[in-house]
């Protein structure tokens, strides 16, 4: 997720911004997902569904795709790079900084109760918080072994390997809404790492209009399936369909898989530009994730500060959602830039100095 962790700088003169823009879009997709999930808006998924509820459903379906794209990006860059202990240490320090810092602030202002258990969870967030970051750390530690294995596979064998994983881990769960093996989030993210590695090793980097249309096709299919399930639920007065309308947006959905792959291919091959602003903002996507999805911030920002539920009876729900998502992204980015300037850069320089 973090540009400093995932990207090996390939252009010493002018770094391209296509993938960096994609990172920003992905974190916004994840914030939008949390707007619905953590904002408690799922309670409105009833037979009384209307356009506003359908909008909220559609807003929620992009988060897992964003996670999958982040891991494709990691696989794409890291398959030809080495996992460095320094980068892992900086990641762990960032996690602890936000986890412990936010907990301390909440205790100081009496927004949380101090306890030894909560303190330990804040000191060791890699074991208790942020499933995505925990899985990311595990995968990062396994990168040397993954790369050694994947680089030995020829293109045909690699493609067959991915095909088997796709059928078992994505197609079957999507069709029957049930996993046949214990293919959890970690397993899915590992497959997405493999996909990114395959794209880097065995595909050409050339612009192709089909990537755009395939990206649109999977996105439209995802939205269409949500609306279809809503329609079936209303038609046959079965609320279960409405409550499960977002099942096709799960992290192991074949539709989400396709959308993630072709979104990445579209941005990688069809978009080519350089922007210092985009590159500057994208390096804080991890910080944005850690701040806004912190367990203390989560309940506070979604349910205490201008909650989305207060706008479900208003025509302003669309404006409110967009505004709140963007404000969260901007504020979290500013906070992370301060952290980088005050803490991370000095630590980074100190580590480099001691290394010499």
Which residues fall in each region the model found?
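Short, Lys/Arg-rich, polar N-terminal cytosolic tail immediately upstream
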Residues: 1-18
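Transmembrane alpha-helical segments and their boundary/interface "anchor" motifs
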Residues: 26, 53-54, 60-71, 78-107, ...
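Aromatic-anchored segments of alpha-helical transmembrane domains
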Residues: 28-35, 98-107, 163-176, 218-233, ...
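Interfacial loop-to-helix transition and helix-capping segments at the boundaries
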Residues: 54-67, 120-135, 174-192, 227-260, ...
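Hydrophobic transmembrane alpha-helices
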Residues: 72, 76-80, 139, 143-151, ...
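Solvent-exposed interhelical
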Residues: 83-86, 141-165, 199-217
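Alpha-helical transmembrane segments of multi-pass integral membrane proteins
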Residues: 104, 231-343
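Loop-centered beta-sheet repeat module
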Residues: 158-204
